[in-house]
């Protein structure tokens, strides 16, 4: 799936579809967060129709799971044309959900603006001291203009801050380069270190060191669930969210995003879902690049045991999970996994008629550093020249250890 300029991407829906067409992509899921504007949907579907691309609408929601959030991608299905999608968005229950989603985005925006205030009050001085540049007071109004119609996020805040600091860094770097020309051998080493230090001030560093939620614990986080003043949609549990989504559109695909989850988490969520989770996003390229995909093999083995209706293998997997310290030493979770062992036939029954599907996401955004672009390709379907390029040893090459 990919993102357009209304969320985390760079391109508006029309240019996104045109780009997909040029790259040979014929099926595309465009993802939005918590809600989607009907005007955006109209542009997306009309552009896809003109370019001959099959497009699907995906909306990402969060649900409370223990002391954190898990994410689901809701993909309503069964639309015949643009009008049918727009009619669906006008239905009372869908409209109510979209309105609640807007409230979530408004709340999240305020948290980001609070982070900007903290940056001005505290972090700017730290950067000025460490990098030797005069950090200006950053304007919330300028930041909102920078974001435009896109989503107000900490990632975009990182890029905005970087855009304001970059001219200062470049000016300082030019001064250092001039000093290097006439510096003594002893001073050259110090000046080169100074130059290298200036190169380190990237949007990624700004996010990791000063802007991510863990660096500003006084501000409510979208990463951790809490019973505070956040909108009700951010307080709903897994069962409540899935029930609501399936009630609104029974012919829906609900994909569990597994990037930050263990196989034990996935099993527990499948149990809570009672068959309403139709797919697992086994691999997300953005999450992989960030080093968050740590249990891919184990999750895939769990999925295969369920889809093959292999009760013996599923029992072995659950027993192994049960022996882990984080489960064995937690009375509540230990009891839950005992319940799983007693209900293996029921777990298998969730996917007796329709297997638990797999999804692979490029999650293309082009934001905060280098990421893979949109889409995947099967090597055997490519021209021989392209296959030879793939076969060459490269740091970019890797195999996906999946069975589907």
Residue positions per predicted region:
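Charged catalytic cores and adjacent phosphate/nucleic-acid-binding surfaces used
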Residues: 2-27, 35-97, 103, 166-185, ...
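Phosphate-binding glycine-rich loops of NTP-binding sites
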Residues: 30
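Non-catalytic, alpha-helical, charged scaffold/linker segments
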Residues: 84-196
């Amino acid at each position: 799936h990919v993102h357009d300029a209304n969320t985390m991407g760079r391109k508006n829906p029309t240019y996104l579809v045109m780009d997909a067409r040029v790259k040979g992509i014929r099926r595309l899921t465009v993802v939005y967060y918590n809600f989607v504007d009907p005007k955006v949907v109209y542009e997306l579907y009309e552009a896809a129709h003109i370019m001959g691309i099959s497009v699907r609408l995906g909306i990402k929601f969060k649900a409370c799971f223990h002391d954190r959030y898990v994410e689901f991608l809701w993909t309503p299905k069964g639309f015949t044309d643009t009008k049918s999608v727009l009619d669906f968005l006008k239905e009372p229950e869908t409209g109510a959900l979209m309105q609640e989603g807007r409230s979530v985005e408004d709340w999240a925006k305020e948290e980001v603006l609070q982070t900007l205030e903290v940056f001005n009050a505290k972090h700017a001085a730290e950067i000025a001291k460490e990098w030797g540049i005069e950090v200006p007071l950053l304007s919330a109004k300028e930041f909102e203009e920078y974001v435009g119609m896109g989503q107000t996020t900490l990632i975009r805040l990182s890029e905005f801050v970087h855009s304001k600091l970059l001219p200062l860094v470049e000016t300082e770097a030019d001064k250092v380069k001039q000093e290097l020309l006439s510096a003594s051998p002893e001073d050259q080493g110090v000046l080169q270190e100074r130059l290298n230090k200036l190169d380190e001030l990237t949007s990624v560093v700004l996010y990791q060191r000063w802007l991510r939620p863990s660096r500003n614990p006084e501000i409510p986080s979208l990463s951790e669930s809490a019973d505070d003043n956040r909108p009700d949609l951010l307080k709903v549990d897994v069962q409540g969210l899935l029930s609501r989504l399936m009630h609104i559109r029974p012919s829906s695909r609900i994909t569990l995003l597994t990037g930050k989850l263990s196989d034990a988490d996935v099993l527990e969520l499948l149990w809570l879902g009672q068959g309403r989770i139709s797919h697992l996003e086994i691999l997300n390229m953005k999450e992989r690049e960030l080093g968050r995909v740590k249990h891919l093999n184990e999750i895939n083995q769990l999925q295969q045991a369920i889809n093959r209706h292999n009760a013996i293998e599923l029992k072995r997997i659950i027993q192994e999970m049960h022996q882990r310290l984080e489960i064995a030493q937690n009375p509540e979770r230990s009891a839950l996994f005992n319940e799983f062992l007693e209900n293996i036939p029921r777990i298998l029954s969730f996917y007796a008629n329709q297997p638990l599907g797999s999804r692979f996401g490029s999650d293309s955004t082009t934001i905060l550093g280098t990421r893979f672009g949109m889409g995947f390709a099967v090597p055997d379907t490519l021209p021989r020249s392209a296959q030879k390029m793939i076969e060459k040893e490269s740091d970019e090459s890797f195999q996906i250890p999946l069975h589907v």
